[in-house]
């Protein structure tokens, strides 16, 4: 009698081999998957980083997708000019041109009656007139004393272009548009043979409780902090300085037990706005003990040290930091390349190959 393998055994062996191959393929794919968590306080630029990933590592924004942002941009313009006009009353600032008081009242009436996300000609005329007023500009210069979108002057200075009947938002317009992030937004893309899953979560206090669901298996955290927020208060609590809130949040994340083995990269964002602001507003408004030079370099390095000094495990955990401008595609591309290299290096370390 021969001891040949039965057809059934052969089939079982074939299936077993197929399963092993599938498991190995899944393991290889998982090893190449990077779970990236974007954290930071509200309005620190996280969502702009996500948009940049679409521009840099996906196919960018199609004309149709850009057009979808038109109503968001118009909404941002209206919110911005309304915020300035309301702040004039709060701060006791008068219009330079008395006739602008009527324009201010007209703005409020039109804002109530205009369909959301549209910009009819009479509304454009009123906004244009108000934005040219010296009193409105004086109020804008005190924007740190009230809540105003960073993109306010960008859009208002280009009102004629963005209200043209044939207006199609460009990538910079899209990058500067602001919609509050609620919940968790996932973006997938590939870089240097790695598959990224990037999670952007809402930064306002009410949104943070949702972060916990993203914690497991995170490869890297990018923490965004707005350099320019050193003289500003929170949207949700006007008693709390935004920079102090950001430091408090960073402290809780970089020293959290969940992230003991997670790479952390600090994006000190909005460096362009910070460079302009530091010429006018001393850093001591946020850090009373600071008596250094009020230059971009010295003040920026001081803020960086405030964050990095919070790391309680400096001997075993390095925190990588970069000064960034999230609306500058080339800057984000350069910095994200560096982040990818850090992730590759850390993965090699984990495998004992570095």
From Swiss-Prot:
Binding site residues for GTP: 40-47, 175-181, 200-204, 269-272, 326
Molecular-function annotations in GO: G-protein beta/gamma-subunit complex binding; GTP binding; GTPase activity; metal ion binding
Region (G2 motif), start-end ranges: 173-181
Tissue expression: In the retina, expressed in the rod photoreceptors.
Residues at which Mg(2+) binds: 47, 181
Keyword Heme in annotation: no
Region described as G4 motif: 265-272
SMART domains the record matches: G_alpha
Family matches, as InterPro entries: Gprotein_alpha_I, Gprotein_alpha_su, GproteinA_insert, P-loop_NTPase
Alphabetical UniProt keywords: Cell projection, GTP-binding, Lipoprotein, Magnesium, Metal-binding, Myristate, Nucleotide-binding, Sensory transduction, Transducer, Vision
Annotated region (G5 motif), positions in chain: 324-329
Origin superkingdom: Eukaryota
Region (G3 motif): 196-205
Keyword Phosphoprotein among UniProt keywords: no
Example of a GO biological process term: background adaptation
Residue ranges of the region described as G1 motif: 35-48
Region (Disordered): 1-28
GO cellular component entries: heterotrimeric G-protein complex; membrane; photoreceptor inner segment; photoreceptor outer segment; plasma membrane; synapse
Biased composition, class Basic and acidic residues, residue ranges: 7-28
Lipid-anchored residues (N-myristoyl glycine): 2
Cell compartment(s), UniProt: Cell projection, Cilium, Photoreceptor outer segment; Photoreceptor inner segment
Residue span, G-alpha domain: 32-354
Family membership noted in the UniProt record: Belongs to the G-alpha family. G(i/o/t/z) subfamily.
Subunit structure: G proteins are composed of 3 units; alpha, beta and gamma. The alpha chain contains the guanine nucleotide binding site.
Its biological purpose: Guanine nucleotide-binding proteins (G proteins) are involved as modulators or transducers in various transmembrane signaling systems. Transducin is an amplifier and one of the transducers of a visual impulse that performs the coupling between rhodopsin and cGMP-phosphodiesterase.
The protein's name in its UniProt record: Guanine nucleotide-binding protein G(t) subunit alpha-2
Gene: Gnat2
């Amino acid at each position: 009698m021969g001891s040949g393998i039965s057809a059934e055994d052969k089939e079982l062996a074939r299936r077993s081999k197929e399963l092993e191959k599938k498991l190995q393929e899944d393991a290889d794919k998982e090893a190449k998957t990077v779970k990236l968590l974007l954290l930071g306080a509200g309005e620190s630029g996280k969502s702009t980083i996500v948009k940049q990933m679409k521009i840099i590592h996906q196919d960018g924004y199609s004309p149709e997708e850009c057009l979808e942002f038109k109503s968001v941009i118009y909404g941002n313009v209206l919110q911005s000019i309304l915020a300035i006009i309301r702040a004039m009353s709060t701060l006791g600032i008068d219009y330079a041109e008395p006739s602008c008081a009527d324009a201010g009242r007209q703005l409020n009436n039109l804002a109530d009656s205009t369909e959301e996300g549209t910009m009819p000609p009479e509304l454009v005329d009123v906004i244009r007139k108000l934005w040219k007023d010296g009193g409105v500009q004086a109020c804008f210069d005190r924007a740190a004393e009230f809540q105003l979108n960073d993109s306010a002057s960008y859009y208002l200075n280009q009102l004629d272009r963005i209200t043209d009947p044939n207006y199609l938002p460009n990538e910079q317009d899209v990058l500067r548009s602001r919609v509050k992030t609620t919940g968790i937004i996932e973006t997938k893309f590939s870089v240097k043979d790695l598959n990224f899953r990037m999670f952007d979560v809402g930064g306002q206090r009410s949104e943070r409780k949702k972060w916990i669901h993203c914690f497991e298996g995170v490869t890297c955290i990018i923490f965004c902090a707005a350099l320019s927020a050193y003289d500003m208060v929170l949207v949700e609590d006007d008693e709390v300085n935004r920079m102090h809130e950001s430091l408090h949040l960073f402290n809780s994340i970089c020293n959290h037990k969940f992230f003991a083995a997670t790479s952390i990269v600090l994006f000190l964002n909005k460096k362009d706005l910070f460079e302009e602001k530091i010429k006018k507003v001393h850093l001591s408004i946020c850090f009373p003990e600071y008596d250094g030079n009020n230059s971009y370099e010295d003040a920026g390095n001081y803020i960086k040290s405030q964050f990095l000094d919070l790391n309680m495990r400096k001997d075993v955990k390095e925190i990588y930091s970069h000064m960034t401008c999230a609306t500058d595609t080339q800057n984000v591309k350069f910095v994200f390349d560096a982040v990818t290299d850090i992730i590759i290096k850390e993965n090699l370390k984990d495998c004992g190959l570095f």
